[in-house]
UniProtKB/Swiss-Prot annotation:
Domain of life: Bacteria
Protein name according to UniProt: ATP synthase subunit c
Pfam families reported for this sequence: ATP-synt_C (PF00137)
GO CC annotation: plasma membrane; proton-transporting ATP synthase complex; proton-transporting two-sector ATPase complex, proton-transporting domain
Subunit structure: F-type ATPases have 2 components, F(1) - the catalytic core - and F(0) - the membrane proton channel. F(1) has five subunits: alpha(3), beta(3), gamma(1), delta(1), epsilon(1). F(0) has three main subunits: a(1), b(2) and c(10-14). The alpha and beta chains form an alternating ring which encloses part of the gamma chain. F(1) is attached to F(0) by a central stalk formed by the gamma and epsilon chains, while a peripheral stalk is formed by the delta and b chains.
Function, as annotated: F(1)F(0) ATP synthase produces ATP from ADP in the presence of a proton or sodium gradient. F-type ATPases consist of two structural domains, F(1) containing the extramembraneous catalytic core and F(0) containing the membrane proton channel, linked together by a central stalk and a peripheral stalk. During catalysis, ATP synthesis in the catalytic domain of F(1) is coupled via a rotary mechanism of the central stalk subunits to proton translocation. Key component of the F(0) channel; it plays a direct role in translocation across the membrane. A homomeric c-ring of between 10-14 subunits forms the central stalk rotor element with the F(1) delta and epsilon subunits.
Protein source organism: Alkaliphilus oremlandii (strain OhILAs) (Clostridium oremlandii (strain OhILAs))
Chief place where the protein resides: membrane
Chain's gene name: atpE
Alphabetical keyword list: ATP synthesis, Cell membrane, CF(0), Hydrogen ion transport, Ion transport, Lipid-binding, Membrane, Transmembrane, Transmembrane helix, Transport
MF terms in GO: lipid binding; proton-transporting ATP synthase activity, rotational mechanism
Topology within the bilayer: Multi-pass membrane protein
Length: 88
């Protein structure tokens, strides 16, 4: 029986790392849901400030989404363009 080669170990670790990176997408999703709920509450309390509330909420959600996008990019790099495999 043969042992695990270096390439197989890197591929397995990359798959685990990609999965962990995608778990990082949960945080922004939960945060954006809370922000949208609070924005809806704020508009309900002050309908005349709807434009300001919407603008601030969308800016905050865009900033929060960058974390999810970065984790997706890292996962895609680990799965499809892994630079560590070339080192073997």
């Amino acid at each position: 029986m043969e042992g695990i080669t270096g390439k197989e170990l890197i591929l397995a670790a990359s798959a685990i790392g990609a999965g962990l990176a995608m778990i990082a997408g949960l945080g922004p999703g939960i945060g954006q849901g809370i922000a949208a709920g609070k924005g809806a509450e704020a508009v309900g309390r002050q309908p005349e400030a709807q434009g300001d509330i919407l603008r601030t909420m969308l800016l905050g959600q865009a900033v929060a989404e960058t974390t999810g996008i970065y984790s997706l990019v890292i996962a895609l790099i680990l799965l499809f363009a892994n630079p560590l495999i070339r080192l073997l």
